[in-house]
């Protein structure tokens, strides 16, 4: 976590609390740090999401292919997570995809802060996102994908057409 960005996030959240404003999902940017290449890539949402205001799914724009809402960018209200009954299979990698996907329809209000809060370091051998490691764990990825697919009937359970479109990819 970036210290200055975390301080900004906490200040924003305190402001919501002081004004008695409910925000179900706080969204921020994240940065991929490719350690061995010495490069980094920031993933932000400033053209897809409204900034500096509370918004709903019906106010979102279109996401580019590289703008997925991943665990690194999402901070849910605790009661939203509890109500989601996240099905987390034990001893399984890639469950962060369940965390990033299943609670979304329960989020009625969101806030996007254009801050680089989380830095994700990639490139270590044996890391779960390493290509060779992913191939060995395809069964786990399939298990997670099936859980995500079975979590909703997108046309029956997801009210917002814009959220549905995002969730369908």
Can you annotate each of these PLM segments?
Residues 1-113, 118-136:
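Donor-binding/catalytic cores of nucleotide-activated saccharide
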